[in-house]
Amino acid sequence: MWITLHRLAVLSVIACLAAASFGPPPAHAVSQQEEIRISREFRKEARRRLKFVEDPEVELYVDGMGRRILEAVGNIRYPYRFFVIQDDSMNAFAVPGGSIFLHSGLIQRVETSDELASVIAHEIVHINARHFASLSSSSDATMLVGVLGVFLAPVLGPAALAGPAVAMTRQLEFSRQMEEQADNLGVGYLARAGYDPQAAVDFMNRLYRERILNPVGRPRYLLTHPLTDKRIDNLEASIRVLGLKRPRFRGVDEIQRVKLVIELRKDPEAVVERLRKARDKRPQSAMATYSLGIGYAATGRWIRARDLLERAARSEPAIPNVDRDLGRVYIHTQEFAKAHAAFERILKRKPDDPVTHLYRGQLFEKESRFRQAVRSYLRVRQFAPSWPEGARRLGHAYRKLNQPGKAHYYLAHSYLLRDETGKAIDSLARAAEHYEPDSPRRQVIEDEIAAIRAGG
């Protein structure tokens, strides 16, 4: 009887939290349009003050993960964007209006893709449920932007954890109810998207143990996401009661590849030396051979990279994206036929992979086959519409085809996705000049200019 009553109690709590997630924020809260503007202004300032990871494999991995979870959410209120900041601290934060930021240190600390997805799902709930609007003590959007500025500090050392900084951080600390709502809805979205809901519990347990062992050096993530053993217990109970299933084993986790890319960005030669020593100890290991090949590619040693990646592919063809890596290396070794074959192999398995389409577009450009390059970059835009580089590449490809109208148009969209609205408007105006005044295409462009100006 107790189990039945407990199950009903947990289900009731979850139902209330779910209903609350789409309930109205306080009357004094900023509007949704104001939240979107705040998100855009915050991104502009973040680009000035923080270092972003601008690597297609890292960016598109995180973006793809976020899009996959958003499909499970369904009711999307905001134009969501996902970013990775080059920062060794373990942190992630959401900004009202749809922007989610992950520190590279967090990616390095998670053990699986599912754990990282659990963090993203949690942050999506905070945004979609308008928790920031509830935290704000007034309708003054400028004040909220000022409080969010605490996230722009590149390093939050002991001196920063005092006085005004800690006061501002506390203003962004989510309540117990908000955290439970983000936990319970988040694991539901996680499972619906095909990720392991238990990963959220695993990640929280590890954070909790670390906090107990080192209460002074707690992760920045916990400053705004208070963690208690009761919160973990409640999440475990929710997973059991909702009957959320763990997915079947999916092979080698792509997170290891992404973590290696991030590591190579910091100190490539030191990482390559470590990878070389690791392979010397296990010369028959396909993964050790593959990792060293990636290291050589990152440092421009293309022939060595090719030889190792080919060896790894022969030994273990199931390594995720090994054909994509080979295709990219073949471009640099001028073996274009092999590059095409490698890309075709991976696209048969993963036709919607934007990174492969990006590299294939680069291959077509090397061959001066610009129409085919355009088709590849259009695929990148299709599968990663909010990634600026896809639009930029498309604009340059159209320029090589002597189609300046389309070139300026897509370059404008790349600026817009980087929140450079002035440059976007200028490029759209240049694009409009290449179409007749009464043409439908020009009208679309002029409407876009008007919409950008109206958005501020």
Predicted regions and their residues:
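Extracytoplasmic and endomembrane cell-envelope/extracellular-matrix remodeling and assembly machinery
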Residues: 27-28, 40, 52-54, 60, ...
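Catalytic Zn2+-binding segment of zinc metalloproteases
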Residues: 114, 124-141
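Canonical positions in the second alpha-helix
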Residues: 278, 311-312, 345-346, 379-380, ...
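Structural marker of alpha-solenoid helical repeat scaffolds
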Residues: 281, 315, 349, 383, ...
